[in-house]
């Protein structure tokens, strides 16, 4: 969802009551209008997904996983994950645990890679050209974060505790659990990297479905 219109106080306040009180409070807690808009946009996307699944958004309750990932109570086959960056909020929904991440691509120093990644991932980054480094870095970063979110552990899981295997087919080498994970990337949004990770196996190509607030 492109959330720029939600930065308007009038639009923001007009849509705010459409989401649960907990999301209203979270959205209003941000200092900057862009962050408030992103948070509200994420809540509106979740509302829409719940309605499409035949679930009344007004009657849902959430609980937190061990890694503080929100999980929907009473609906074991409805798994979701939210992410936002720049002016976009995204939502992924699946029938098994899912993690999604979107990042707006900006300049970042190569030296940063040495501090956060597994040695195999560092080798991948070091092999990138100057032109390819920024998109390659954000591909890797979003793939890693999508996996961390799919496990439910989030950033309680160290970035160097597992290795994303970058190749013709994306994979992960990990000892976090004994589950299998599938990955895919969405490259339909220029200037952004988007990755999806789902527990249970391979994922096909996922098209980006844009929702714009007018």
Name each region found by the language model.
Residues 1-214:
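Core catalytic alpha/beta fold that binds nucleotide/phospho-ligands
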């Amino acid at each position: 969802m492109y959330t720029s219109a939600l930065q308007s106080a009038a639009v923001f306040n007009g849509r705010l009551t459409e989401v649960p009180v907990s999301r209203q409070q979270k959205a209003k807690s941000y200092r900057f209008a862009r962050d408030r808009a992103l948070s509200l946009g994420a809540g509106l996307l979740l509302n829409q997904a719940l309605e499409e699944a035949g679930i009344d958004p007004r009657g849902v309750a959430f609980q937190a996983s061990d890694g503080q990932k929100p999980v929907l109570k009473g609906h074991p086959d409805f798994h979701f994950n939210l992410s936002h960056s720049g002016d976009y909020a995204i939502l992924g929904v699946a029938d098994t645990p899912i993690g999604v991440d979107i990042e707006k691509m900006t300049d970042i120093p190569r030296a940063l890679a040495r501090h956060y990644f597994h040695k195999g991932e560092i080798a991948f980054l070091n092999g990138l050209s100057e032109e390819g480094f920024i998109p390659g870095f954000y591909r890797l970063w979003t793939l890693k974060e999508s996996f961390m979110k799919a496990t439910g552990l989030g950033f309680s899981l160290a970035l160097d505790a597992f290795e994303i295997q970058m190749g013709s087919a994306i994979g992960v080498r990990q000892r976090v659990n004994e589950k299998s994970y599938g990955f895919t990337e969405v490259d339909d949004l220029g200037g952004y990297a988007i990755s999806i990770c789902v527990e249970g196996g391979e994922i096909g190509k996922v098209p980006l479905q844009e929702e714009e607030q007018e």
